[in-house]
Design a protein with these regions (language model features):
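Terminus-proximal functional modules
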Residues: 1-76
Length: 76
């Protein structure tokens, strides 16, 4: 049987705010964007998520990050 995946799309805006699935995450005071994104990705990685792609939106200086993890089938 083929592996099944679930996906998550994360939007990162030019100010470094992150939104995913209707929830917005904001940097801590004084935290740079790179450290903030790393901290966010570490949290998702601990939950089994893996980055599989980044789609930059050049004109708006923002991006979409696509993650996936194995889908857990519900027991019947």
């Amino acid at each position: 049987m083929a592996m099944k995946w679930e996906y998550r799309v994360v939007y990162v805006d030019p100010r470094g705010r992150i939104s995913s699935e209707g929830v917005e995450f904001v940097r801590q005071s004084g935290e740079n964007r790179t450290a903030f994104m790393g901290r966010y990705l570490d949290t998702l990685g601990n939950d089994g998520w893996e980055v599989v792609g980044i789609h930059p939106l050049i004109r708006s200086e923002s991006s979409y990050t696509i993650l996936k993890r194995p889908k857990v089938e519900a027991e019947a």
